[in-house]
């Protein structure tokens, strides 16, 4: 049943690897409909394993414009075999999480150094102590210096992480070229601080350096959409970009409505059309494979009841079928409410999933 569905309507695929214990489960989801077209437990997650599954999906009509995935080498190498000309955009979530982890580590280091300094000051203030002050004072001075340095590093890293998240990798941001300049600035700042913590800061800097084009690929897609909106609505491009940037502000803030009024005055009756088009363009430009993580959270309640995945192909296939044919009771995306992922993807209705399994039509409820 899962293999009979035509996948040609999928334009953006989200790929990731989830795990049950130490066993990888390869997953692929349509970014628009959340239709899960790949859910397979395998012994390996290397290039050949991914390539075999993606080639099978290609035979079923899957030819996405691009995919979104993390920096996994096996996943990306497998895609190169299946779709040599299909771009694989970077997943911004993982690099942001890695940066946030580094910030938290240095925040804990700074907090620990402060605790040591406060303990030593308490010891020095004790009138009953019986020791020389000279050694303790030297130690206290060293702790003051270490604490100041640790807090400074933590603050610097936190600032860089916020810039990366809110100014560079955010949907509501500048054009791609400007993002690249800001991205390179952050990498350069990390390089200047790398000597302070080579293993951790160095690893993050290298990851950012190697993934720049993949992580910022979404910005190129968004730029093209905004350019198309400006041409269609016949409005200056900078006003369309300003409309995009206005999405940064909460609609409960004064600055949001001030910006809203300025743009409305500049574009007149076209503003509402442009606003709706920009909102739709931003909503249809994925930057991460987080929907796979969402699928993982739904699967987890089932996976935790099993210590292994023996017979996993059939069992996971049934779960995949259930998730693809169960209708959404509610959703933030209005077009999904009351429809199943398959119905959203294909545009055609289907019977209840129990009926599709051959269990007959649903019986009316008896009062």
For the regions a language model picked out, list residue spans one by one.
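RNase H-like nuclease fold core
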Residues: 1-85, 92, 102-112, 130-141, ...
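C-terminal domain-tail junction helix/linker
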Residues: 155-158, 162, 166, 170, ...
